[in-house]
Amino acid sequence: EAEPRLWAVWMHRKGNVHDVALTNGVGPRLHHVGLWVRGELDVIRACDVLATTGWRGALERGPGRHGISNAFFLYLRDPDGHRVELFTGDYQTLDPDFEPIGWKLDDPQRQTLWGHPAPRSWFEEGSPFVGVEPREPLMPVRPVVAR
């Protein structure tokens, strides 16, 4: 890009890829909260528990693997509608001198290395902040969505 622009931010407090993610789109809104689990089987077990306890509809995306973080992921909605990511297998970011890795927005593998593309809700829905009116983004969004 001739003029690099910030499209998303992943923030962490404990050296993993992220705990909170903010992305471009109508907002400001919280996209999701990330919760690290020990391994891939914990993510699969969460799918089994949700499906067998009447919460299958809470599954929004996944399981799959992200290109950016290499994380094995599952996204679900909590009872209040907030998006939660269960993930594992990401890399550590403990070194403050670590050079950020740049990804092109038109690279579909940055979002999903393998697995189904994100649903439209992934780009159009988020948790609003109290007292802050969401507005259209300054940078247009052209998401790759599941059909």
Roles of regions detected by a PLM:
Residues 17-20, 82:
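Short, charged/polar, Gly/Pro-enriched secondary-structure boundary elements
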Residues 19-22, 30:
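Solvent-exposed, charged amphipathic helical/linker segments at domain boundaries
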Residues 21-24, 45-46:
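A short secondary-structure junction signal
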Residues 27:
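Long C-terminal interaction/binding lobes of large macromolecular proteins
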